[in-house]
């Protein structure tokens, strides 16, 4: 089952 994920972490 697909997992609900948030936005990808973008390094500074």
Curated annotation (Swiss-Prot):
Keyword field: Hypotensive agent, Secreted, Toxin
Gene Ontology annotations for the cellular component aspect, listed alphabetically: extracellular region
Subcellular location(s) of the protein: Secreted
Main location: secreted
Keyword Transferase among UniProt keywords: no
Protein name listed in UniProt: Bradykinin-potentiating peptide 10 g-AP
Family stated for the protein in its record: Belongs to the bradykinin-potentiating peptide family.
Tissue distribution: Expressed by the venom gland.
């Amino acid at each position: 089952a697909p997992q609900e994920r948030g936005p990808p972490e973008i390094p500074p």
